[in-house]
Design a protein with these regions (language model features):
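Short coil turns linking two alpha-helices in DNA-binding domains
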Residues: 52-58
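A short, conserved structural fragment
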Residues: 65-77
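Short beta-strand(s) of the beta-wing in winged-helix/HTH DNA-binding folds
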Residues: 39, 70-72, 90
């Protein structure tokens, strides 16, 4: 069915573009893209968004998971280490493809370069950044 607004599929696509480009969600997607492993922990996402409450970061990550853009990945029980994160957040293959298709990954390399220049990361963030990730072992 086609309307003045386009087909139902086009409308869904526009809604999803609008959804992922909402300020907080798009910032979180960019945080994932700029992370060295593209798998930050919740703590890292919270630290990278100091003007947003931890609860809001969590809520928007959950919305991105529900939409199929982001996935939660966890270390196996035998790989977990006390004092280190074991849950991480990354783009799904479908999420990456959608962002690529709509030219929302254009700044990926620049984001990674900017992240590399952050020199005043809290010690805990550096520790978490270097924590083992699924697939490392």
């Amino acid at each position: 069915m086609s309307t003045d607004l386009g087909t139902a599929e086009e409308m869904e696509t526009r809604e999803l573009v609008h959804f992922v480009t909402q300020q907080t969600r798009f910032a979180l997607i960019n945080n994932i893209l700029q992370h060295p492993e593209q798998l930050p922990s919740m703590y890292e996402l919270e630290e990278l968004n100091p003007s947003v409450s931890d609860a809001t970061v969590y809520k928007h990550i959950q919305k991105l998971i529900d939409a199929g853009i982001v996935k939660e990945v966890a270390l196996d029980d035998d790989q977990r280490r006390q004092g280190y994160p074991w849950k991480f957040y990354g783009l799904t293959d479908e999420g990456r493809a959608f962002l690529e298709e709509h030219n929302l990954l254009a700044a990926e390399e620049t984001l990674q370069q900017i992240y590399d220049t952050i020199s005043d990361k809290p010690e805990k963030m550096v520790k978490y950044e270097n924590a083992p990730r699924p697939g490392d072992v």
